[in-house]
Amino acid sequence: MASATATTSAADLAAVKVVLLDIEGTVCPISFVKDVLFPYALQALPVTLDKKWDSPDFAPYRNAFPEPAASSRPVFEAHVADLVKRDVKVSYLKALQGYLWLAGYESGDIKAPLFPDVSPSMRAWHDAGIKLIIYSSGSVPAQKLLFGHTNASPPSLIPIISDWFDTVNAGMKMESSSYTSILSRYPDTQPQEWLFLSDNVDEVSAARAAGMHSLVVVRPGNAPLPECHVGEGQAVQTFEGLAVGGKRNESSKSS
């Protein structure tokens, strides 16, 4: 079991076969989720409930909410607004948000603003045989919407992503058991052959405790890092030049 503040060396990166990626604050700005996605869902909710409150296709999302919210539209709306305001990460809210974002992505109103280094690096790693997997507190359907509608060219990165994990099929991201659960799905790959990239130091520590290599990703708008997570082998500001599997991508500026 690795230390929560263990460093990741160039040799460690060269041995990596799987990159596990967080989303918010790692591949796209935190502000996209808080300032674009969350408000969009709240704005779309009343119109959606006008049309869908009693419809069979909306029933799974509505019935996933606890009572009395599931039976009362005013309570439902108030509960959603409260959860969003407090940034509570519960699976039934995440599923509803993904449902509400679908129309926005499909209409082109929403495009995920990936950092410039993300798409070129992910494609370079994929071309080098590195498996790419997503792990986010957002639901798997919402993850696929985001990576299917980005500002990159081509806009969809779904074809190069091998698997998707959220708090439902893996567990909470700050618990080492969640990373152990993900590892168990890939018994032919050793923990030390995984690299988890996230802006959250507690998630990074949990992944390291499960035996993965992990780096804190420092992006504009992210919270300042604790001193123990600052330094070479602890944090990165860009995926560019990160020689995962011995493959270094330095093309993001020209892509």
UniProtKB/Swiss-Prot annotation:
An annotated GO BP: L-methionine salvage from methylthioadenosine
InterPro entries cross-referenced by the UniProt entry: Enolase-ppase_E1 (IPR023943), ENOPH1_eukaryotes (IPR027511), HAD-like_sf (IPR036412), HAD_sf (IPR023214)
Chief location of this protein within or outside the cell: cytoplasm
Catalytic activity, as annotated: 5-methylsulfanyl-2,3-dioxopentyl phosphate + H2O = 1,2-dihydroxy-5-(methylsulfanyl)pent-1-en-3-one + phosphate
Residue numbers binding substrate: S136, S137, K173
Main EC class the enzyme belongs to: hydrolase
Similarity comment text for this entry: Belongs to the HAD-like hydrolase superfamily. MasA/MtnC family.
Protein name (Swiss-Prot/TrEMBL): Enolase-phosphatase E1
Native organism: Verticillium alfalfae (strain VaMs.102 / ATCC MYA-4576 / FGSC 10136) (Verticillium wilt of alfalfa)
Lineage: Eukaryota, Fungi, Dikarya, Ascomycota, Pezizomycotina
